[in-house]
């Protein structure tokens, strides 16, 4: 049986096992285009609907249990029931839901982030997308320039989408694209557009682009070339700040001018932030007596009703202050590297063109023989085989992204990870024997 024929069979089996999810999907499509409001959740024949979650386990509306190896695309690092976060959020919300003013927790979280990640200043947003938009605005105002350099395969939010080139629905910035993990090619693009470049924005590892880590030399040469022409370096660490004590960029031996954050720091609540050098972030200083306005200088306005919302800010304080400390982050990165090696060991036992890429606790399966180093390698994979692996893992109680992404969480037990490896082994064996 060909992979394409096997996919049709697997989809029918999936539909037969999940009638309640199908019913929910059909009803939801009456009111929401596509049946949901998050495009990445789409897969054939229809996405699962979940009823509950506890620890690292999800339960769908048909009653099936899954080991959650997706972790909400890195936002669910803590699992589904971290009481050290939830108890503090509940207590804060009992006191006040929306103060309409400043509150002590936001200064606490700002201090925790600056000390943890080695940044001078930070401001909060509602998402990583907003954080990246504000980081770009910061760079444009600081330089007086308008052009942005991004990378083919990069993703910085729903309106900063470059996974398959610049999406036509993107925010209307003047963007030039450079090849990821190609230092010489990037240097040429920067040299060509240098006089008009406000910023270079880059992920230390392509997230939506397939968990493809950057080469350290590529990052260093890109940053040096950007600074040589006066452009601001923006590192999108919305996903990768989870790695090591200060984020993946630090482990690569580089430092950006502005860094964006999000995902797990909100403890499951919406969160984003952008921070970095004081001279850049102080463009937002509205202090009446000592700020930029008092000196007759331009001040950037940064509004947002929920930028400092009580739930997200309180959760962030608990996440960085108690749960995901620097020591825990360092150990978790090591555990992720070890688990990815185990995954590679399982793959090596089967005669299928499948590999794994990633860094620390983030990784992705690819239906191709050679590990991709850029988005072209990711795009070259066998889509039918990719889907068979995804559906096969679901059938065996393991929830991943349809595109192959897997993220290790704090709630995963060694027993659960062993069961994941067994499920992957059994899935690949079944595919190879079709």
Language-model segments: residues:
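Structural signature of PLP-dependent enzymes
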Residues: 13, 319-344, 376-383
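Glycine-rich loop-to-alpha-helix module at the N-terminal edge of alpha/beta enzyme cores
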Residues: 65-142
């Amino acid at each position: 049986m060909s992979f394409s024929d096997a996919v049709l069979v697997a989809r029918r089996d999936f539909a037969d096992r999940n009638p309640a999810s199908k019913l929910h999907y059909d009803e939801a499509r009456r009111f929401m285009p596509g049946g949901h409001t998050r495009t990445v959740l789409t897969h054939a024949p229809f996405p699962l609907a979940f009823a509950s979650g506890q620890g690292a386990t999800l339960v769908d509306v048909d009653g099936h249990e899954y080991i959650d190896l997706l972790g909400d695309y890195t936002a669910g690092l803590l699992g589904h029931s971290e009481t050290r976060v939830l108890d503090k959020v509940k207590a804060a919300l009992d006191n006040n839901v929306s103060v309409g003013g400043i509150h002590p927790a936001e200064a606490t979280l700002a201090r925790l982030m600056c000390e943890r990640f080695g940044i001078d200043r930070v401001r909060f947003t509602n998402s990583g997308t907003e954080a990246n938009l504000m980081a770009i605005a910061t760079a444009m105002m600081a330089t007086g320039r308008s052009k942005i350099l991004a990378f083919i395969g990069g993703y910085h939010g729903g309106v900063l989408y470059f996974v398959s080139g610049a999406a036509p629905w993107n925010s209307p910035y003047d963007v030039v694209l450079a090849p990821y993990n190609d230092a010489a090619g990037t240097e040429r693009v920067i040299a060509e557009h240098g006089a008009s470049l406000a910023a270079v924005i880059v992920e230390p590892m392509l997230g939506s682009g397939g968990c493809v880590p950057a080469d350290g030399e590529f990052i260093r040469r890109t940053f040096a070339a950007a600074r040589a022409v006066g452009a601001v370096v923006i590192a999108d660490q919305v996903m990768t700040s989870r790695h090591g004590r200060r984020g993946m960029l630090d482990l690569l031996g580089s430092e950006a001018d502005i860094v964006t954050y999000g995902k797990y720091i909100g403890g499951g609540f919406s969160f984003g932030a952008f921070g970095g050098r004081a001279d850049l972030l102080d463009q937002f200083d509205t202090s009446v007596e000592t700020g930029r306005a008092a000196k007759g200088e331009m001040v950037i306005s940064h509004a947002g009703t929920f930028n400092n919302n009580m739930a997200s800010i309180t959760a962030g304080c608990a996440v960085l202050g108690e749960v995901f400390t620097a020591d825990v982050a360092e150990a978790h990165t090591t555990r992720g590297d070890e688990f990815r090696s185990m995954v590679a060991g399982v793959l090596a036992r089967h005669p299928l063109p499948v590999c794994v890429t990633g860094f620390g606790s983030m990784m992705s399966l690819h239906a191709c023989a050679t590990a991709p180093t850029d988005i072209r390698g990711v795009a070259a994979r066998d889509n039918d085989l990719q889907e068979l692996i995804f559906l096969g893992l679901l059938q065996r109680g393991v929830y991943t992204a349809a595109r192959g992404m897997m993220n290790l969480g704090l709630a995963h037990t060694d027993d659960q990870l062993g069961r994941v490896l067994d499920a992957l082994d059994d899935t690949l064996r079944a595919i190879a024997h079709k």
